[in-house]
Amino acid sequence: MRDRLYTTEALIIRRSDVGEADRILTIYTPHHGKLSVTARGVRKMTSKLAGHLELFIHTRLQLAKGRSFDVVTESRVVQPFRSLREDLSRISQGYYVAELLDQMTPDESDNPALFRLTCETLAALDVLDDVVRRDVILRYYELHTLILSGYRPHLFDCANCERELSPDADRYSPITGGVLCQQCSSNEPRTLPINLNTFKLLRYLARMPLETVVSLVPAPATVQEARLVLKASLSQILERELKSTQFLNLVRG
């Protein structure tokens, strides 16, 4: 239960204009989860909130309880992540992270670890110039969003029989939920190929903190294959492809 007037950190992950000057914001918070709130008059040039409630911003909000939506009364930017709104490649990645977070989380279900992961991911995307390194960060975010949402892919034991995987495991099953041993993969026709380098990359991403991963520059083909298997897992769970994927692919070329 939230107080009538409360303060929270928040990430702005979606927004829509309503009326002449208001906006409905979808925010993700560490202790209240995902909320829809209203920012009254924010589109007016004279609004004190203008510029403090942009997409992808990490902010600290003061909110008042309302009938339909809680109301933003104050906002103080914690991290602006300006590059995520100024560079087309980063814009597409910011939209992707925001939509993935939005679709993978129910309303008002707190997950502080997922909030921290998203802040760290946006911070890395904001400063990294190397395209491959930013792609690795997206793979890290996809994998750990799955993990923190209760869908940890099997990368160390077979997704079917749960025996320890050997380096010759080369099939990934989004339906079963991870890598299959050779014996089990022969009985599952709907699998994706996963080579040894991709297998090692996903294991590394699962084990290491993001601050270590930011310096990693694998072969682009390895990152691409990791993208395909993680995309398949996400599509299996969400039962659709994220809308921002098309924008991301278009910008990537």
UniProtKB/Swiss-Prot annotation:
A Pfam family assignment: RecO_C
Key words of the record: DNA damage, DNA recombination, DNA repair
Alphabetical GO biological process terms: DNA recombination; double-strand break repair
Residue ranges that the Swiss-Prot or TrEMBL entry lists as coiled coil: none
GO CC annotation: bacterial nucleoid
Stored InterPro entries: ARFGAP/RecO, DNA_rep/recomb_RecO_N, NA-bd_OB-fold, RecO, RecO_C
HAMAP family: RecO (MF_00201)
Family (UniProt): Belongs to the RecO family.
NCBIfam families: reco
Role description: Involved in DNA repair and RecF pathway recombination.
Name of this chain's protein: DNA repair protein RecO
Protein's organism: Herpetosiphon aurantiacus (strain ATCC 23779 / DSM 785 / 114-95)
Protein encoded by which gene: recO
